[in-house]
């Protein structure tokens, strides 16, 4: 099971327009001043990651409405606001799988799973996955099966997807 560390980060939140993401800039860790309140600090280790459970409808269709300073309203996709955050989704039926095949690419063996849940199509992208014996996991492990996933919201070719980075991020029913 994956484990994570809890840290305190001090910096400035800024939007990275080229990458289309928010980031924290100005993070520092001064080893000569370990008590500096601006340091990056390890708080705890070995924590189970937190995943916000999301429905397919919310992931694909939900809009979040904001009010601007002038009182006008505008809406953003829930998935856009959830970019690069960890979510989980349950009961996805795997209908198709595309496996990356390229000897020149580190993603050789990574898979794109086209899933259906509640009448909606959700895309799950994996890293190259390995089982406990170090063998590469193939599409046979997931095709025509129902799965639960834990991953990170991403965007590929204008479509939101759930990126799964390790085998324990997928549970087969």
Give, region by region, the residue ranges found by the protein language model.
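OB-fold nucleic-acid-binding modules
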Residues: 1-173
């Amino acid at each position: 099971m994956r484990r994570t560390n809890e840290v305190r980060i001090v910096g400035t939140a800024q939007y990275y327009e080229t990458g289309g993401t928010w980031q924290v800039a100005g993070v520092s860790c001064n080893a000569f001043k370990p008590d500096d309140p601006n340091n990056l600090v390890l708080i705890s280790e070995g924590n189970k990651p937190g995943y916000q459970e999301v429905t397919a409808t919310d992931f694909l269709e939900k809009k979040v409405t904001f009010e601007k300073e002038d009182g006008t309203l505008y809406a953003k996709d829930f998935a856009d606001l959830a970019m690069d955050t960890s979510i989980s989704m349950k009961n996805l039926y795997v209908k198709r799988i595309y496996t990356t095949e390229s000897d020149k690419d580190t993603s050789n063996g990574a898979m794109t799973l086209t899933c259906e849940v509640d009448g909606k199509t959700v895309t799950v992208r994996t890293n190259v996955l390995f089982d406990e014996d170090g063998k590469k996991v193939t599409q046979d492990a997931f095709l025509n099966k129902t799965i639960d996933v834990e991953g990170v919201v991403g965007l590929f070719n204008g479509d939101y997807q759930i990126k799964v980075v390790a085998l324990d991020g997928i549970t087969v029913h």
